[in-house]
């Protein structure tokens, strides 16, 4: 017994869905539908570029403003600068044999407390760096 299927279509039939005997032309609407995502993607790309340019300009302006040295009167008038200085004009690199400078800040309560220098490692970090030779050398061989 042999079994075979024949999938040939007669010449007058099409493989398109049945539309009730009416022919519709979907050409221009399909082209417009395909162009909408492209337009949306282009608009998003332009918005992203505009946002990046705006952020870069504002950060450059803020950087130029912060590079200006502070006057003494500005430091005294602004409690944020006097409590947490970003850059101390008297700060020098620590050289061997140089004395440490102690900076005290008057708090809101009126007491004076030393300010931690964020650019100088803490005593614990210096102690850890001094004991580097105690760490065993591990090899991956």
Swiss-Prot record:
GO biological process, one term: regulation of oligodendrocyte differentiation
InterPro entries for this protein: Opalin
Sequence ranges on the Extracellular membrane side: 1-29
Glycosylation sites: 6, 12, 14
GO cellular component terms given for this protein: cell-cell contact zone; Golgi apparatus; plasma membrane
Tissue expression from the record: Brain specific; expressed in oligodendrocytes. Expressed in oligodendrocytes in remyelinating multiple sclerosis plaques.
Keywords: Cell membrane, Glycoprotein, Membrane, Transmembrane, Transmembrane helix
Recorded superkingdom: Eukaryota
Entry's transmembrane regions: 30-50
Location of the region described as Required for plasma membrane localization in the Swiss-Prot/TrEMBL record: 77-93
Region (Disordered): 61-99
Protein role: Central nervous system-specific myelin protein that increase myelin genes expression during oligodendrocyte differentiation. Promotes oligodendrocyte terminal differentiation.
Protein name: Opalin
Organism this protein belongs to: Homo sapiens (Human)
Membrane topology designation: Single-pass type I membrane protein
Compositionally biased residues, Basic and acidic residues: 65-94
Residues exposed to the Cytoplasmic side: 51-141
Keyword set includes Transmembrane helix: yes
Gene behind this protein: OPALIN
UniProt KW Transmembrane helix keyword: yes
Major localization listed first in the record, in broad terms: membrane
Localisation per UniProt entry: Cell membrane
